[in-house]
């Protein structure tokens, strides 16, 4: 599962972290600087 979250959106970043997601890399997305979060489900 992946999520693209704007760097300025700390609430969504905290939610992703609480779900166990980690930052994979920084990416530009639709003109915004974002983080790509992911989690591996087994």
Tell what function each PLM region has.
Residues 1-42:
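Acyl-donor (CoA/ACP) binding surface of acyl/acetyltransferases
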């Amino acid at each position: 599962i992946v999520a693209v979250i704007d760097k300025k959106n700390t609430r969504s970043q905290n939610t992703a972290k609480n779900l166990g997601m980690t930052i994979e890399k920084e990416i530009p997305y639709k003109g915004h600087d974002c983080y790509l979060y992911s989690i591996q489900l087994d």
